[in-house]
Structures are given as structure tokens and as C-alpha cells.
């Protein structure tokens, strides 16, 4: 959706502890349904800055889909602010934090870090990041900064 992307793709997600914790908090709050959202950042920067939790239109424990009107509003807002979706995240409630075939087929933002959080273990959330381009999934390290 964001045709202006002009940055480079790094092989690591650098994310602040605050944003990291907000993603996990959202995933736990929406459990047993999958949670979803984006973290916007300056276009081309690969720097996640603005946390945008979104509604799972499916309200499902096994599938997520952004509400189309909310997604349109959020992407327009990012365009207006010269931002892009640096992170697109969602949770898995009963399986590991690895993209499903559906997740892979829906991945349409080549610049984005696709973050998955598994909430299957109440004591400890599993947080992982991937690049998904052309159907290929590559896990990348996550650097949580203070």
C-alpha cells in the first residue's frame, strides 16, 4: 500500500523496550483472539516510532485481518506524516511465533519487519521478527533498546 518506500532493508529489528512491551501487552489483552497492529516510523528510516494498535476484524483466535476502513485511515495518516509501516505485528494464541501460510500470502510490505508474538505460554511471550518478501520468510534478530 505504501508506494513511496525508498529506504533500505536491514537484517535486524531495533525496537525500544517501550514499543516491545506495548506489542506484548496488546497481544495479552486481546488473547484468546489474535491481536494486530503496526508501528509507524519515518519513511525510509527503518526506525519504529509510533505504536498503532488495530482491531482484528475477524475477532478470531486463529486468524487476523485489519478492518479495511481502519487500515485505510491509518495508511493515509502515515502518508500524510511521511511515515510507513516499519513493523506489522500480530499474535498467535496457541502456536509458535512463526508466520502461517496465510500470513506469508498476505505479506505485502517489503520494507516491514513482520513481528509475531505467541501468547500460548502465559508466563512468557515469544517475540520474533521476520522479513517476508516474495513468499520467502527470513527470521531476523531483535535488538531491544532502552
Task: Name each model-derived stretch.
Residues 2-85, 94-146:
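Conserved beta-strand-loop surface patch within small alpha/beta domains used
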Residues 88:
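Conserved, mostly hydrophobic/aromatic
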Residues 91:
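Metallo-beta-lactamase
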Amino acid at each position: 500500500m505504501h508506494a513511496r518506500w525508498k529506504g533500505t532493508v536491514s537484517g535486524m529489528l531495533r525496537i525500544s523496550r517501550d514499543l516491545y512491551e506495548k506489542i506484548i501487552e496488546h497481544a495479552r489483552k486481546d488473547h484468546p483472539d489474535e491481536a494486530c497492529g503496526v508501528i509507524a516510523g519515518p519513511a525510509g528510516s527503518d526506525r519504529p516510532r509510533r505504536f498503532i494498535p488495530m482491531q482484528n476484524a475477524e475477532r478470531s483466535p486463529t486468524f487476523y485481518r485489519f478492518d479495511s476502513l481502519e487500515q485505510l485511515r491509518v495508511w493515509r495518516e502515515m502518508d500524510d506524516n511521511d511515515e510507513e509501516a516499519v513493523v506489522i505485528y500480530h499474535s498467535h494464541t496457541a502456536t509458535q511465533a512463526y508466520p502461517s501460510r496465510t500470513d506469508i500470502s498476505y505479506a505485502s510490505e517489503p520494507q516491514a519487519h513482520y513481528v509475531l508474538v505467541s501468547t500460548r505460554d502465559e508466563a512468557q511471550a515469544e517475540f520474533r521478527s521476520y522479513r517476508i518478501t516474495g513468499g520467502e520468510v527470513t527470521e531476523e534478530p531483535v535488538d531491544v533498546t532502552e
